[in-house]
């Protein structure tokens, strides 16, 4: 068996095209276009790349993109004040603060300062709580994008045994909630998990988000399983690889996401979807 690649790049492009059409329709109806404020603190190279991609995607679909590039020495109070300004700005529908933040700034304070109706990253406790209660509104972007990828396969997720490897607030935990909502029997694995291999081998669906190249050997994958690889790791050679041993895993799986071109593009597409949702549901 050779797995079918799930083409996140193509699916994300299709979403962006649909969003662009919706923005055009809003303009023609005399409505304002959605606005996204993107805040970057410091000059972390990876963060700069991510932020650049998000701003470019905004412009592509016709959103207003507000850029705030702050020095790494910016105080916590100054950042919170900027968030307050964006919260009160009626032209801004979504506020994104690029993580990680400098050590002197408390991430939880920043996330909780963003109004829940402008939390297009889906990290605010209100939005995570809504997902936990099975009534999601603004959803965490990477898990949301993964659910879109799963839907594209046509596979019925109800009753599947799913294993999520990684328990971060950004991916692992909300991913487990999304899969529960989609009818999976979900196991979340983390650094204290025993017998990880046994759990992965028994899974119909595996989502891996740990940030370690080749962390899951390909021969652990159950024949016919679906593999979602969230990891993006750069080797010394410059090659980008995921958290799963792709070449071997693709001989076992039915569907697999490549790295790059799998989950990554969907995170940004979901961010744009959330921004339009916030505009239409909360701010029109």
Curated annotation (Swiss-Prot):
Query: Which Enzyme Commission number(s) are listed?
Result: 1.5.1.5, 3.5.4.9
Q: Which domain of life is it from?
A: Bacteria
Q: Which InterPro entries match?
A: Aminoacid_DH-like_N_sf, NAD(P)-bd_dom_sf, THF_DH/CycHdrlase, THF_DH/CycHdrlase_cat_dom, THF_DH/CycHdrlase_CS, THF_DH/CycHdrlase_NAD-bd_dom
Q: Which UniProt keywords apply?
A: Amino-acid biosynthesis, Histidine biosynthesis, Hydrolase, Methionine biosynthesis, Multifunctional enzyme, NADP, One-carbon metabolism, Oxidoreductase, Purine biosynthesis
Give the reaction(s) catalysed: (6R)-5,10-methylene-5,6,7,8-tetrahydrofolate + NADP(+) = (6R)-5,10-methenyltetrahydrofolate + NADPH; (6R)-5,10-methenyltetrahydrofolate + H2O = (6R)-10-formyltetrahydrofolate + H(+)
Task: State a GO cellular component annotated for this protein.
Answer: cytosol
Gene Ontology MF terms? methenyltetrahydrofolate cyclohydrolase activity; methylenetetrahydrofolate dehydrogenase (NADP+) activity
Q: Which residues bind NADP(+)?
A: 166-168, 232
Indicate yes or no for the key word Plastid: no
Short name of one Pfam family for this protein?
A: THF_DHG_CYH_C
Gene Ontology BP terms: L-histidine biosynthetic process; methionine biosynthetic process; purine nucleotide biosynthetic process; tetrahydrofolate interconversion
UniProt entry tagged with the keyword NADP:
yes
Q: In which pathway does it act?
A: One-carbon metabolism; tetrahydrofolate interconversion
Record family assignment:
Belongs to the tetrahydrofolate dehydrogenase/cyclohydrolase family.
- Described function: Catalyzes the oxidation of 5,10-methylenetetrahydrofolate to 5,10-methenyltetrahydrofolate and then the hydrolysis of 5,10-methenyltetrahydrofolate to 10-formyltetrahydrofolate.
Per its UniProt record, what NCBIfam families does this chain match? PRK10792.1, PRK14186.1
According to the record's subunit comment, the protein's assembly and interactions are: Homodimer.
Please give the name of this protein: Bifunctional protein FolD
């Amino acid at each position: 068996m050779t797995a079918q690649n799930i083409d996140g790049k193509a699916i994300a492009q299709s979403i962006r095209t649909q969003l662009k059409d919706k923005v055009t329709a809003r303009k023609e109806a005399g409505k304002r276009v959605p606005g996204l404020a993107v805040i970057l603190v410091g000059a972390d190279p990876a963060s700069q790349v991510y932020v650049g991609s998000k701003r470019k995607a905004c412009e592509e679909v016709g959103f207003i993109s507000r850029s705030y590039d702050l020095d790494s020495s910016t105080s916590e109070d100054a950042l919170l004040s900027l968030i307050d300004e964006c919260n009160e700005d009626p032209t801004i529908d979504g506020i994104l603060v690029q993580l990680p933040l400098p050590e002197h700034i408390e991430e939880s304070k920043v996330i909780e300062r963003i109004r829940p109706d402008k939390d297009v990253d889906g990290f605010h406790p209100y939005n995570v709580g809504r997902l936990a209660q099975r009534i999601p509104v603004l959803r965490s972007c990477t898990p949301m994008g993964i659910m879109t990828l799963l839907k594209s396969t046509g596979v019925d997720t109800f009753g599947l045994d799913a294993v999520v490897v990684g328990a971060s607030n950004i991916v692992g935990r909300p991913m487990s909630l999304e899969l529960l909502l989609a009818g999976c029997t979900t196991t979340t694995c983390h650094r204290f998990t025993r017998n990880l291999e046994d759990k992965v081998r028994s899974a119909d669906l595996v989502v891996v988000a740990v940030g370690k190249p080749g962390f899951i050997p390909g021969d652990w994958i159950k024949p016919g399983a679906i593999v979602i690889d969230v990891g993006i790791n750069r080797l010394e050679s410059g090659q980008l690889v995921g958290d799963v041993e792709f070449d071997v895993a693709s001989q076992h799986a039915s569907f697999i996401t490549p790295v790059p071109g799998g989950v990554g593009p969907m995170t940004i597409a979901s961010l744009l979807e959330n921004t339009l949702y916030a505009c239409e549901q909360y701010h029109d």
